Amino acid sequence: CVQQNKKSRSARDMXXSXDALE
């Protein structure tokens, strides 16, 4: 999730919890 978030902000929505780590 974190890796995708760095690639695109839109991906952070999918990650969700992953985004919380960052």
UniProtKB/Swiss-Prot annotation:
In terms of superkingdom, the source organism counts as Bacteria
Q: Where is the composition biased (Low complexity)?
A: 13-22
Sorted keywords for this record are: Ribonucleoprotein, Ribosomal protein
Please provide, in alphabetical order, the Gene Ontology terms of the cellular component aspect for this entry: ribonucleoprotein complex; ribosome
Lineage here is: Bacteria, Pseudomonadati, Pseudomonadota, Gammaproteobacteria, Pseudomonadales
Q: What is this protein called?
A: Large ribosomal subunit protein bL32
Into which family does the record put it?
Belongs to the bacterial ribosomal protein bL32 family.
The segments labelled Disordered in the record are 1-22
What is the primary gene name for this protein?
Answer: rpmF
